Amino acid sequence: QNISAETIKAALTPNTKAIIVVHLAGMPAEMDDIMALAKEHNLWVIEDCAQAHGAKYKGKSVGSIGHVGAWSFCQDKIMTTGGEGGMVTTNDKELWSKMWSYKDHGKSYDAVYNR
């Protein structure tokens, strides 16, 4: 059974900053309710899509609904790199820019490609 807005709401504290939603066994969680709850409480939503490659929620690909999608390509996952690996996705340019810099010791995209 997937996480739900109801189970999340019961666990929220004043220290909660984000919700990590795991789409289990290719079955997306009820994202409309979760996103509404996150908006109400000003929380980030991170989708763990490691078990849901290609899955859709109401026509939208998982990993594109929350603020960030996280994809593990570890050797025991659906899609692998033959070892350790992964990917993050976002529709937010500011988040993308920050995440991009993490992969290269803090260098910005502009510093690498627009000098």
Regions found by a protein language model. Give the residues of each.
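Substrate-binding/gating loop at the entrance of the active-site cleft, primarily
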Residues: 1-6, 76
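Catalytic PLP-binding core of fold-type I/II PLP enzymes
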Residues: 5-20, 25-59, 92
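Active-site region of PLP-dependent enzymes
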Residues: 52-58, 65-115
